[in-house]
Amino acid sequence: MKNNHLEIRTISLEKNLGFAGGYNEGLKQINAEYFVIVNSDIEVTKNWIPPLIEVLKNNNSISAIQPKILSLTNKDHFEYAGAAGGFIDLLAYPFCRGRVFNHVELDEKQYNTYSEIFWASGACMAIKSKDFNVVGGFDKDFFAHMEEIDLCWRLKNLGKHIFYTSESTVYHYGGGTLEYSSPKKTYLNYRNNLWMIHKNFKGKIPLLLFIVIRIFLDQISGLKLLLSGDLKGCLSIVKAHFSYIISIGELNFKRKQYSKLNFHDLKGYTNKSAIWNYFFLKRKTFSEIKGK
């Protein structure tokens, strides 16, 4: 790229900092009012940026906005990583309008809206640079996966809002950097989810009890993987739990820092359990679980 595209500025890092650290370092070099974050496996459409910037420009309280994210390989379906905007359930499990766990919906314009969400996908979002920097950007310790949910949660605790618009559409290949079945992806997802909860959760029940419930449910998930023959996936969950435990000191420090951001806006949070609805009540879509 350096030899053939001299017009493109490149930034060389000494080691792989992952999605979170890599973006932080790159965005430090940019002096702009807005950042547009786009994964390398995204295919954009014509005039997709203006609808995003227009929303940010005209709304002081909105920090970030996500376009509609459809699958690059199955273009009439939503894509796993973001779909039509992210939410979290009663136990802080992330899911999306258009994608609940592994069930991905056909795009029938059912989510052609301008709506508030809990988190915008790291695969593609626009965000105000000032707000990004105020909350410290992505948590580099996450490396990859759920760092955007953690970021949006901190922004919401600052009193800001996260939105989705269907006026902009992109296509995402998904799993282009790390396959969905990768043990490393499993490890990062489970570890980072616990980290995110420890840093940001403020609820009616004590944090410790909340974490114990989540670890118990994680272990059930690990047992399911083991019984299906996925030993590596099961061990990845065990490893994630150990990593969480040895990180508690650092997480407590971060939690104390972020406790100053005490607005605790939970729009985009649902008091329903996605697990109960999906696995026991067989409700597979966002509308069935939360309502439109």
Give the ranges of each region predicted by the language model:
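Glycine-rich, basic loop-to-helix element that forms the pyrophosphate-binding segment
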Residues: 12-30, 40
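Short aromatic/hydrophobic "clamp" motif used to bind/position activated sugar donors
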Residues: 35
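Active-site-adjacent helix/loop segment of glycosyltransferases
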Residues: 158-273
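A short, conserved alpha-helix in the catalytic core of glycosyltransferases
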Residues: 112-169
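Acidic donor-binding segment of Leloir-type glycosyltransferases
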Residues: 1-12
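A recurrent flexible, glycine/aromatic-enriched loop bordering the glycosyltransferase active site
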Residues: 90-96, 101-127, 149-151, 178-180
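Conserved donor NDP-sugar-binding/catalytic core segment of glycosyltransferases
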Residues: 43-93
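Acidic metal-phosphate-binding loop of nucleotide-sugar-dependent transferases
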Residues: 17, 42-43, 69, 142
